[in-house]
């Protein structure tokens, strides 16, 4: 990875990590992560997971009838789960590709035979409605796929613009909010985000 080393602490060099995740954590967070997890076949585990679901839905601004699926895999595994379980080859998606994670969505659509058109953006450039219109033209789509925050470039896409476009065109809105969750505003209900 990319990083710099700071002074030694207790004989261990401290490094600041500049790679795209996993991210640095403070001692208090690492201590919580080191705690034992309840055995998964107990009611205690079920209670913890139900509380986690309640909190994720609350902090995502999801509708009351929403459910949260926890995936014991990478962010890419979650992206793939959304593509392969929500869309079919009968769908057609618009995918914002402004960096490595947008490109990953395109590759996942290829793997799962989901027809799509990519809105290819120059590195670091914000999405504009004219970009959407230039690709969409008179084509019919069923879904719009975007990384709220394209981690590889640092661009936060204009979710109000995307939401408005999806509402006007009756598109399913699939949003990767992995790197923005709890850091940036994201309200699924207000945006009409489906996944």
Label for each model-derived stretch:
Residues 19, 23, 28, 51, ...:
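Conserved PLP-enzyme active-site core in the AAT-like
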